[in-house]
Amino acid sequence: MARRIEPSKKSIPDILGDLRSGYREAVIIGPSAALKFLERTQESQHSLPNAVKCFLFDLLAETRAQLGDWEGCNEAVKGALANLAAAESDLGAELKNSLPGMSLFERGIAARSELGDFEGALQLCDEATARGLGAHFEAKRASLAWAR
């Protein structure tokens, strides 16, 4: 009797690498193709690790912002924030290196401002500043201070 071939189990960093690679290929075509890739990945990967979901939602936020879908962008930012703790625990060094280039804070602030949720935009400024992402977010916060 033949032995059953066990499915290969990828590591979380490998899964993240696959996500980024697929996104890079799709985004060359344009944001609509990137959105399609990300939505298909989200739908088909029911067991996607939460740490990778953080990055997926971040890419969704960027793509939806490029398409002017501010409500979708805001929802993606919420998803990224909900999975941020998992990314910190499972991909700590990768997240630390990637966070300055990620879109969730920048695009989240823009989305919430576009939707009139200035308090939410200020909260994102505070969280970005608390994570050490720099004076850029302090300046954004100062420019939104009138909303309080």
Language-model segments: which ranges?
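Amphipathic alpha-helical repeat scaffolds of TPR domains
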Residues: K10-R24, L48-G68, K78-L81, A85, ...
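Conserved positions within tetratricopeptide repeat
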Residues: L35, C54, N74, E119-L122, ...
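Helix-turn-helix repeat elements of alpha-solenoid scaffolds
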Residues: A26-R40, W70-E88
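TPR/TPR-like (Sel1-like) alpha-helical repeat modules
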Residues: K78-A85, D117-A135
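Boundary/linker segments of alpha-helical solenoid repeat arrays
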Residues: P49-A51, A86-G92, A130-R141
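Structural signature of alpha-solenoid helical repeat junctions
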Residues: V52, G72, L95-S103, L133, ...
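Solenoid-like repeat scaffolds
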Residues: E6-K9, Q42-P49, T129-G132
